[in-house]
Amino acid sequence: SPSYKSRSVLSGLERVYELGLTDCAMYVFILLLGFYILMRTFRARPPVAVFGAVAWAFSSYFFIIIGAGHLWKVLTLAFIPPTIAGMVLCYRGKYLWGGVMTMFFIAWQILSNHLQMTYYFIFAMVLMSVGFLITAIREKQLVRFAKGVGIFVVASLIGVAVNSSNLYHTYQYSKQTMRGSSELATAGKHDQSAASGLSKEYITQWSYGVGETFSLLVPNVKGGASGAMTANEKAQADSHYAEYMQTLQQLYPQLGGSTPGLSQYWGEQPGTSGPVYVGAFVCMLFILSLFYSKGAVSRCLMLVMVLSMLLSWGHNFPAFTNWMIDNFPMYNKFRAVSSILVVAEFAIPLLAALTLSRMVSEPDLLRKKPIPLYISFGVTAGLCLLFAITPGTFFGDCLTGNEHKILNELRGILQPEMVNSFATD
């Protein structure tokens, strides 16, 4: 993003928060620190807060996007948990600390210049706010909540205002890009979004598959990262794969091309650097939270997770996705809807850590209510076992579009040979 003199003080303060660390160490550190701060605002004990921070920071997505060079996205995501922590403090009557934290972390989010992630997490913050509103009504603390909302909004506006120069110039040049209005597209006929933003096809080109969502539990449920199967040691040791490649080497030269290879990844996306994975133990604690979590905020966090999954499916869930693109403000300005699954990757560790926090603070909980633990362990272990024993039951076709093309080409080679053989007989 452009560097303006007006941002030098804000950038300097950010470097202090990052302890002057560089490269990957800095990204991991601020991911850990930000979520730790959030857990402490939820009154979790330090060891539990550390667990939550590790579960968030060491989920696979962050290392994938660091490797892919999406460094501004990592920075933005690292500043989101402490922003939400500021919101929580505001709603709980800690107006000064909540306002200061909100102001700085929103300012740093926008400074990181990846507005798509900020936009996606607005959904999470709105739903969490609904949860806090319900709690305030139950506890008869509406006045405190209203003050908190006011301070949070003012602090947010200040955080946005200090980045006004960057936002203004981004807005101006966006009009001349594919995210601006198109002079060629006609709204209303086929794709309303193309007239004022990106086309639906482009927005949903990277859409997470419905079955692919199980990668949160089992990382390679769709093969893992894109790449030639020749790099996979297990495939090289498989005799069937060796026979397949030998057959291709014999047949494919007839088409005048080089021998193709199979891809490790066979999901619905055009390609991927790796799956979104949070870990089996974290998933088990999340399932446990369905039984042990208390309060409206936790329930709203579950809605956050479900919403992000539905939106991440993109063209695999067209009714909801198309409605969002056509009707929700600014939703058609961002591509790769699969990336919204990072919101679920936030909600799941948070709910898991909050559940662990309750178990630590109430030592007799498991003794009094042991059945939910058996259910959560059984569901997690049962799914993993089923995927291991009968993977074909859940994921029948393991071929991508490219592999189907290879098969069709092979049929084209073999069919004339079979006809000639029949004619000779």
Q: Positions of the model-derived regions?
A:
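Periplasmic/ER-lumenal interhelical loops and adjacent helix-loop junctions
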Residues: 1-5, 9, 165-289, 392-425
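Loop-to-helix entry region of an early transmembrane alpha helix in multi-pass inner-membrane enzymes
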Residues: 4-33, 66-75, 272-273, 338-342
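Transmembrane-helix motifs of polytopic, lipid-linked glycan transferases
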Residues: 26-42, 282-285
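Transmembrane-helix signature of membrane-embedded glycosylation machinery that interfaces
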Residues: 35-44, 84-87, 91, 290, ...
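Alpha-helical transmembrane segments of multipass membrane proteins
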Residues: 36-38, 61, 86, 107-108, ...
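Transmembrane-helix signature of polytopic, membrane-embedded enzymes
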Residues: 39-58, 94-99
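Contiguous transmembrane helix-bundle modules in multi-pass membrane proteins
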Residues: 53, 69-80, 90-107, 115-156, ...
